[in-house]
Amino acid sequence: MAIATAYCGHRAARASVLLTGLVMVVGMSLLSAPAWAEEKVTISAAFSPDKLGAPALVKGGAEFSSTTSRVPSPISKITIIGPAGLSLDLKGSATCSQAILEEKGPEGCPARSVAGSGGGMGIFELAGQIIEEAFTVEVFVGNNKPGHYEVLLYVNAVSPVSVQLVFHAVIVQFPKPYGLGFSFDVPEVKTLPEASNASVKNAHLTLGATPAEQKHFHVKGIIVPKKCPKGGFPDEAIFGFEDGSTVAAKSTIPCPKSSKKH
């Protein structure tokens, strides 16, 4: 696992928004100009197990803060881009739908449709007071047809503000040295009257089929590339923020120690 930090800002004279970004990566670089406010993001990612050509879980985490504000700017869009050779095998999986999640919640989805889980800590400001709120994330297969893969993310928070959101993301192929990735917009999350919109302080996410799911449902899920390029697996994630700033994260996941670099 590797960890790195990045900063990004936006021009005061023009609030143009470059929206794209999220969690599966390590290390960062930034795309920005002289800034009015700066967002700081620290991200980590790893494969588990770390074995070439094998089904694995992808585990990622992120910490958010601002250099000029007590609360980081709310996230407006998230994109995750994996390395070339990363593949998905959803044979044996089931699917869920946005309508079911909105009506019944995760309990309405088939067990075979589960594709990951996570959570984190939300944060907002009210009358000078910083308020934190835990949230959970559950990920489901929305479409398991090859070439048309989709995932659904269900975010749930209970107190002090009740929030239930469903995000829809289409999985697409990015140019080399990258591979599969997905992106989704994040709407404004209102909190309490006179309070700021909800931001994220930290988040963690695990994607893929667990060993139990692989055994009982025969779903491989995410498969690590068969070859690791010299220097490791290149990954990228970009976070678009409500204040117009963008943090672009480019990094590598180290090759398995026992693998031969290509």
Which functions belong to the PLM regions below?
Residues 1-14:
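N-terminal secretory signal peptides that target proteins for export/translocation
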Residues 16-29:
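Bacterial N-terminal signal peptides
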Residues 24-27, 35-262:
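Ser/Thr/Pro/Gly-rich, low-complexity intrinsically disordered stalk/linker tracts of secreted
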